Amino acid sequence: MNNVIPLQNSPERVSLLPIAPGVDFATALSLRRMATSTGATPAYLLAPEVSALLFYMPDQRHHMLFATLWNTGMRIGEARMLTPESFDLDGVRPFVRILSEKVRARRGRPPKDEVRLVPLTDISYVRQMESWMITTRPRRREPLWAVTDETMRNWLKQAVRRAEADGVHFSIPVTPHTFRHSYIMHMLYHRQPRKVIQALAGHRDPRSMEVYTRVFALDMAATLAVPFTGDGRDAAEILRTLPPLK
């Protein structure tokens, strides 16, 4: 497992990893370090980090679960309710139907406001999901991941341990919910409108997006290059020529 770039030990190569058009990994990593230093911004992974972490999930069932969290931003409880029937992979615009966790305790057809559709825009992920379903042949209404939340967390911990044993380290704690934060940040990096991301993530309150967008406020401030230091001697000479204030 030595063909993954160590994420902290090769700065020259790391800086070349793309995050989004016009954004490199080194810059995004520095911005994340600044944004999360106060604890106000949720911890998130960048795209190369997610790719590396998925690499250390050789079990396809584990891999496809976390690839699904990454590609959709859904909550872990929502993922547990997914069935093959939830996915539409054959059309021109593949998508997944996500049921609100509130639906779990009810029977019958869920209300419209408790179902959301999320486009699957990564064709590689769509092909992987198709292949996995063909191989495993689950029943159409059978949950794809009928396991406990704790089991899912253990799968993730195993992958993190494999990565660390191979010299790949992550600078933030990684949990299943990290993939949701990572999805939202990835969409923001790709300049998707806030209201669109809010709808896809299932956030009812627009203010919930503010914890993510403040990262880009820091980025904007950092790139303005506003100078504050001047030549004190020259300033004093200029001020000396002015009449005294009355």
UniProtKB/Swiss-Prot annotation:
Gene3D superfamilies assigned? Intergrase catalytic core (1.10.443.10)
Catalytic residue list: 75, 102, 177, 180, 203, 212 (o-(3'-phospho-dna)-tyrosine intermediate)
Instruction: Give the matching PROSITE patterns.
Output: TYR_RECOMBINASE
Which processes are annotated in GO (biological process)? DNA integration; DNA recombination
Q: Which UniProt keywords apply?
A: DNA integration, DNA recombination, Plasmid, Repressor, Transcription, Transcription regulation
Q: Which domain of life is it from?
A: Bacteria
Per the UniProt entry, the disulfide pairs are none
Q: Which GO terms describe its molecular function?
A: DNA binding
- Residue ranges of every copy of the Tyr recombinase domain listed in the record: 40-225
Q: Which CDD domains match?
A: DNA_BRE_C
Any Pfam family: Phage_integrase
- Which PANTHER family does this chain map to? PHAGE INTEGRASE-RELATED, TYROSINE RECOMBINASE XERD
Query: Per the similarity annotation, which family is this?
Result: Belongs to the 'phage' integrase family.
What is the protein's name according to its record?
Probable site-specific recombinase
| Native species | Escherichia coli (strain K12)
Cite the source lineage. Bacteria, Pseudomonadati, Pseudomonadota, Gammaproteobacteria, Enterobacterales
